């Protein structure tokens, strides 16, 4: 893959160069030392993936990510910055603007076997699989049983944190439907993202744990690199299968499990994101007679997943982000 590096620290740039050089299939296409230069280079020489720092001159990595993803030639962006934990709120803002993931900057003396070098290369490989993926998982075929209350099932990827904050923040405090969210996010950030989202809404937001049951007025966030499913008993479980999918956790896997096992109504929502994950699952939900919503192009940070859903006819409604919370509140009262 062709890789762009955006970082104003020479030692950090050199550490990333050395890590990338260990993979003959990767090469550094260019290096930008500030956000403005990164935007210009992405337009002139689009790379396959950008390794974006957060704190830089002129404008920071969040603003650079936002401008790149809104441009005519958006690029896949991986946040690579020092001390991810201390910069968690910046990471979530960047992911809300369209970044796919985040990882600590590799250490210069790490060597080939160093943890930070291996983790960076693993993240780059994961993004490569995402870019190459044809998308989709197999449709489930078992009918859902009648009865029970509505479950709000939301899938999101790049740009998702900001979209989720907007929707959850727009729901009333007495919103009584259970919510389950599958966001493409590394398990290292899931707990922090749940806490961050919890501060954006009057509802309770926490990570989904094995054996949890969806609770009225509570939003549960998938929290591991495994897939989340609903079981026949109505509890949540994590599973490694299907192992081949590049999306972990997969929105399709969760949506399809609802068509098999959820006993009541489902309202499926597919938000901004790169690729096609969730489109086939949303189609399966609609074919079962459930209400389905996809975010529109104008308000999506990355119009990939909702576009795939629209192409398949999976969405009963295609809505701007600002209208989705109101639609959910109205549908949950029916």
From Swiss-Prot:
Catalytic residues (UniProt): 157, 184, 277
Major enzyme class: hydrolase
A GO CC term assigned to this protein in UniProt: cytoplasm
Matches recorded under Pfam families: CheB_methylest, Response_reg
Domain Response regulatory stretches: 2-120
SUPFAM superfamilies recorded: CheY-like (SSF52172), Methylesterase CheB, C-terminal domain (SSF52738)
Record note on modification: Phosphorylated by CheA. Phosphorylation of the N-terminal regulatory domain activates the methylesterase activity.
UniProt xrefs under InterPro entries: CheB-like (IPR008248), CheB_C (IPR035909), CheY-like_superfamily (IPR011006), Sig_transdc_resp-reg_Me-estase (IPR000673), Sig_transdc_resp-reg_receiver (IPR001789)
GO biological processes: chemotaxis
PROSITE patterns, alphabetized: CHEB (PS50122), RESPONSE_REGULATORY (PS50110)
Modified residues (4-aspartylphosphate): 53
Catalytic reactions of this protein: [protein]-L-glutamate 5-O-methyl ester + H2O = L-glutamyl-[protein] + methanol + H(+); L-glutaminyl-[protein] + H2O = L-glutamyl-[protein] + NH4(+)
Domain CheB-type methylesterase per the UniProt entry, residue ranges: 145-334
Recorded coiled-coil stretches: none
Compartments where found: Cytoplasm
UniProt-listed Enzyme Commission number(s): 3.1.1.61, 3.5.1.44
Protein keywords: Chemotaxis, Cytoplasm, Hydrolase, Phosphoprotein
GO molecular function, one term: protein-glutamine glutaminase activity
Entry's family note: Belongs to the CheB family.
Record's comment describing the protein's domains: Contains a C-terminal catalytic domain, and an N-terminal region which modulates catalytic activity.
Role summary: Involved in chemotaxis. Part of a chemotaxis signal transduction system that modulates chemotaxis in response to various stimuli. Catalyzes the demethylation of specific methylglutamate residues introduced into the chemoreceptors (methyl-accepting chemotaxis proteins or MCP) by CheR. Also mediates the irreversible deamidation of specific glutamine residues to glutamic acid.
Protein name as catalogued: Protein-glutamate methylesterase/protein-glutamine glutaminase 1
Lineage: Bacteria, Pseudomonadati, Pseudomonadota, Betaproteobacteria, Burkholderiales
Gene: cheB1
């Amino acid at each position: 893959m062709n890789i762009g590096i955006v970082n104003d620290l020479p030692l950090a740039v050199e550490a990333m160069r050395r890590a990338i050089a260990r993979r003959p299939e990767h090469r550094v296409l260019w290096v930008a030392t500030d956000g403005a230069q990164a935007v210009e280079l992405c337009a002139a020489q689009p790379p396959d993936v950008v390794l974006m720092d957060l704190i830089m001159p002129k404008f920071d990595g969040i603003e650079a990510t936002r401008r790149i993803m809104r441009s005519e030639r958006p690029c896949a962006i991986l946040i690579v910055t020092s001390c991810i934990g201390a910069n968690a709120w910046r990471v979530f803002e960047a992911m809300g603007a369209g970044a796919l993931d985040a990882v600590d900057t590799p250490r210069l003396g790490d060597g080939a076997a160093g943890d930070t070098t291996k983790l960076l290369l693993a993240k780059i490989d994961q993004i490569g699989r995402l870019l190459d993926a044809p998308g989709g998982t197999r449709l489930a075929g078992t009918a859902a049983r009648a009865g029970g209350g509505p479950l709000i099932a939301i899938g999101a990827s790049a740009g998702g944190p900001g979209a989720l904050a907007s929707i959850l923040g727009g729901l009333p405090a007495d919103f009584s439907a259970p919510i389950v969210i599958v966001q493409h996010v590394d398990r290292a950030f899931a707990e922090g993202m749940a806490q961050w989202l919890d501060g954006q809404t009057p509802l309770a937001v926490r990570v989904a744990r094995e054996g949890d049951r969806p609770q009225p007025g509570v939003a549960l966030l998938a929290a591991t690199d495994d897939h989340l499913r609903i079981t026949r008993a109505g509890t949540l479980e994590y599973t490694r299968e299907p192992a081949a999918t590049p999306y972990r956790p997969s929105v399709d896997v969760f949506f399809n499990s609802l068509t098999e096992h959820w006993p009541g109504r489902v309202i499926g929502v597919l938000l901004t994101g790169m690729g096609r994950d969730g489109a086939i699952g949303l189609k399966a939900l609609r074919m079962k007679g459930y209400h389905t919503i996809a975010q529109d192009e104008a308000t999506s940070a990355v119009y990939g997943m909702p576009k795939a859903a629209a192409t398949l006819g999976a969405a009963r409604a295609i809505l701007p982000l600002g209208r989705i919370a109101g639609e959910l509140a109205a549908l949950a009262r029916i």
